Amino acid sequence: MEEPSPVPPAAAPASLAAAPPTTDVLSRRRAHLDSASYRALSRLFSHCLHLHPPRHAARPDAEVEPAAAAAIPPGGSGGLPHGDSPPPADVGGDRGKNLEVEVALGNHAPHETPSTSASPDAAVNPTTDPGVVPQGTEEGRVAGVERVEGVEEVVFAGGTSGEADADGDELGAGAGLMGDDEALRSMQACLDGEDSELVIEMVGNDNEQLQLDAMMNNLSGLIDDASACVMSAQSCGVSGDKLQSDDRVAEEVKELGAGIGNDRSVCSLDHGSLDGGGGFEEGEIEGDTQNLDADDSGNSELQDDVELEEDFDSRRIEEDGSCGHDLKSNLHLIPQKGNGDTARNMLCNSKGDSQMHVARAQAVSYDEVLDWNETPLPDDKALKHGNTRKRTLTEERKAKKTKTKRIKRALQREAEGVKRLKLQPVIKPKVVKVCHFYLHGKCQQGNLCKFSHDTTPLTKSKPCTHYARGSCLKGDDCPYDHELSKYPCHNFMENGMCIRGDKCKFSHVIPTAEGPSTPDAKKSNASSVPEKANCQEQTSRQKTSTVYSGEPATSVPIKHHSILKNLAGISGNAQKVPVRIPRGIQFLPFNKARPDSSILHQDVVSTEKHKNPTGGPHQNFGRPQPADGKKLGKHNGHRSAPLLDEKDSSKQANLHPCSEPKKNSLPTTAAVPSSVSTQHEVSEASRILQEFLFGSGN
């Protein structure tokens, strides 16, 4: 292996001496960071510094690689002005220390693909294109700046030097980084802890929630990048001798640094030049120099993320290979853009700016729309959703509607001059209908019943059985009577005792009988009725007997036939209706009186023959002879006396007419019918006539 020729070291720039220490940068608070983000970054960087303290044991005299020296363009010594002297040799001792610090902080290894870089002039002069980097920028100096939704986290960019020490001790620093895996894990745990704190502090705000998501994604990318840096450093430590002798790789590194430096739109930190021994200035948080808007770095952040992912994948696949092969694959994976793409970069930046502005405008308008939607509209301007259905007319609305119609019609007629006679309506008296069910104590409607309950139900005269048991729930509204003391107790009336005793609500007083209530009394009342009827008949018979007693006997034969007919009709009607007995007539048992009637008929005929021996029986009927007038008068005189004496016995004769047939056989002038067929009827009629005319006298 060929030993590289030493290269004179470059002079230290003035910016290195003027650069503030890391502790001063961390102590100052950035204006563009909120409190939570600033505290998180401060803890993160302080923890990394404590884990990896700086090393002062380094070789004072270090030599650079001739291939790296040849890769540096003329006049472009890392931002140094032309004519500056190279840095002294005693400064090269800090190179190993700076390399370890940068790897611990997440920067790239000396031969790793650099991050985005930009010139400080891009922040100073806003008119120039931030994506264009001047050619005077050092090819190995790369500064990575990542922005996370308003919280800018600055990743310290590790300066790469094209000069390498030919000594084996110089490359031992890269091999010594293999033990930094544990430090990387601790840093990852610290980042996870900081992420959890950020989640707790920023979960309350919706805008900060978006920032939190982007921050977590970028922090995970940062951790992956740091692990890739460690692996790249390890691989470089293994094959460091081969890289020092490869001039072509050095030239590719030069081209890569120049191309990527021209395409980056993010401003880098204050660039420090190489020390005499090749040491680098420690990275610092830029705040005063970086003043870029979030819109200017939108496209660059996307490109950085893509490049870092591709670089990490390639390193994971080829980590067993040589460092030169790894570097070549990275060079092929990362697109290179030179100065000729300035116009294209400007166009991309302008497109990114326009997209960001459009996104912001959309966000603002969306917030305004939300505010406008959340504010309630007044009632008169409220939106009507869907078709409104017509409400059903109630009684009140119908009455109100008809009233308004009548008012409008009346006003219209008044305007037209139409007059209408006002007639008082005829009010018919409303007929009160009594509830039929309430009268019988069965109405279940209560107050809802449409019929009247203003009456006393018929069941009020009956005792309430439920009240007697103590289970009536209707109270005063009960249709039955609750005054049970009016009604006698059945047990006490029938058995003479009551089981309930004094607790019985019915009356235990026996009512006094005003009249006979036994069946014998009823029979006596029934017998008294016909007795009264018989007394009335007797009085009427006495009246009729007094009337007929003053008439002469000669007037009787004139109306004999008519009287017989009337009596025959009366007897027939009496037989048909035996219940109703006319006054003055008493019917006799004719069946028993048949033999008596024949005897009586014979007596009558014999007396007539004796009285009229000379003439026929009908010659002198109704004409008394003058010679015999005295005889008739005497005969009537003799008969009148016994009739008056026997008035007391007339009742007995009426009751038992058949007992004394001789008294009833009085001489009469009744004519006997000639026909034999009517003999029986005539005999009965004559007997009835005698009873009717002369029975009271006997």
Curated annotation (Swiss-Prot):
One GO process term, biological-process aspect: negative regulation of DNA-templated transcription
SMART domains: ZnF_C3H1
Low complexity bias (residue ranges): 12-21, 65-74
Keyword entries, A-Z: DNA-binding, Metal-binding, Repeat, Zinc, Zinc-finger
Ranges that cross the membrane: none
Biased composition (Acidic residues): 281-300
Source organism, top-level taxon: Eukaryota
GO cellular component, one term: nucleus
Biased composition (Pro residues): 1-11
Entry's Gene Ontology molecular function annotations: DNA binding; RNA binding; zinc ion binding
Renumbered residue ranges of the record's region Disordered: 1-23, 56-95, 109-137, 272-300, 512-553, 607-682
InterPro entries with a match to the protein in the record: Su(sable)-like, Znf_CCCH, Znf_CCCH_sf
Zinc finger (C3H1-type): 429-456, 458-485, 486-511
Start-end of Polar residues biased regions: 535-548, 665-680
One Pfam family it belongs to: zf-CCCH
Descriptive protein name: Zinc finger CCCH domain-containing protein 7
Gene source species: Oryza sativa subsp. japonica (Rice)
